[in-house]
Amino acid sequence: MKRNIITSSLCLVLSTGIYAAQQEVQTDSRLHSVRENIDQEAVMQKKEISVTNNIKHMFKDARISGQIRTMYSGYEQKESNVDNNYATALGGKLKYELAELNGFNAGVAFYTSHDLNFVTGENTHHNNELSSSDGSYTQLAEAYVNYNYKDLNFRVGRQILDTPLADSDDIRMISNTFEAYTATYSYKGFDFMAGNIQSWQGGDADLDTPWVKTGQNGTNFGGVSYSDMWELNLWYYNITDTTNALYFDGGIEYEMKNDILIHAMVQYLNETELSTSGYATTIYGALLEVVTQGASLSIAYDKSLNDASTASFSGFGGGTLFTSMDTLILDDIADDRDAHALVASLGYEINKFNFLYAYGDFKGEKNSLAKRAHIIEQDVSLEYNANDEFLVVCVYSRQEDKENALKTDHDWNHFRLMLNYNF
């Protein structure tokens, strides 16, 4: 109870400073879900690569960048005979990237997270989502060779990817990275990408077993994206022995008079089962957002159509659906049933503060056992950007199982506090 009072008070203190003034509409590309907004809070800064004409200066002009992060994450469990759990971790990233010579350069980055035992639960009270069940995690998460020529780029090795069904999802201590072969090409505002993903690691991949395979023979993928006033994404994934997936989203950001921005999107995902994997679905959705004077109001909807004994697969990462929350995504209930999600959110930005509140209603029809699903998640995110380097984020989430009389693993309160420094 004492911990709950402290965390609630901290959220209240941060939120009271948010409503002091107003801010102009931002015309940067809008993010598409609650999860994406939380994900983007602490992305490590990218440093510009130097170009040189000799090998010696490839090393002399190399760039070092990194991130120091500490995080507390605790769950108050409502389910009977399930202990509350919590952990506090310290870690970060350290990256070394060579200067470019004749189009070639290379980079490596270590990601690490270690629980601080004196503020971390033991045994069944331990929260393993920050640093694994062992309380410690270190990986050579990036190690690649890169070649670029004008608007064409090739990269081989462990790298960051952010595509609809494979993304970094930097939402806890360890973000996802991928062992892959990729090629990208830019032409008149269109960005083309193709490649093969062999394995991945990170918070979504299971910290206890890093570098999990992405299909029997990896994942082959290709896509095109465009973002200006109009937005477009069209992607195809062959996740070998699992599913063939076709993804599309498109929409518009239209700035009206009186500082009002309208952001409207639609999306479609079709997955075909391979090798009796059980992954096959059709998902369609829509998003409408209005932004004015630093305030935003949005509503998103997704519908998943599944045959008996099949489920949806949102990919390797946080997922691309408009209704993805901090924790809950449509996959969680779209198994052996049709399901839909409706999410409404309210955001406000003022000076160095950002506020976000979201309410998600997830419902699943009767499955083959005649059981329905109905889960509510509420998220509150409060962010303070002191400058480009230092960030403080407070996230409070709550899930409630509305279908079952007894408390389940979807009944809990979660508080997370992160301090992040980029260098």
Regions found by a protein language model. Name each.
Residues 11, 16-158, 184-186, 258, ...:
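Beta-barrel outer-membrane channel/assembly domains of diderm bacteria
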Residues 68-72, 108-112, 156-158, 194-198, ...:
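Transmembrane beta-barrel strands of outer-membrane/channel proteins
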Residues 78-82, 128-131, 166-169, 208-212, ...:
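Extracellular loop and loop/strand-boundary signature of outer-membrane beta-barrel proteins
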Residues 88-94, 139-143, 152, 179-181, ...:
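Hydrophobic, lipid-facing positions within transmembrane beta-strands of outer-membrane proteins
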Residues 103-106, 151-155, 189-194, 201, ...:
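Repeated loop/turn-to-beta-strand initiation elements of outer-membrane beta-barrel proteins
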Residues 120-142, 152-227, 233-240, 314-337, ...:
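Surface-exposed coil loops of outer-membrane beta-barrel proteins
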Residues 168-175, 199-202, 216, 237-247, ...:
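Solvent-exposed loop/turn segments connecting transmembrane beta-strands
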Residues 227-229, 251-365:
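Detector for outer-membrane/organellar transmembrane beta-barrel domains
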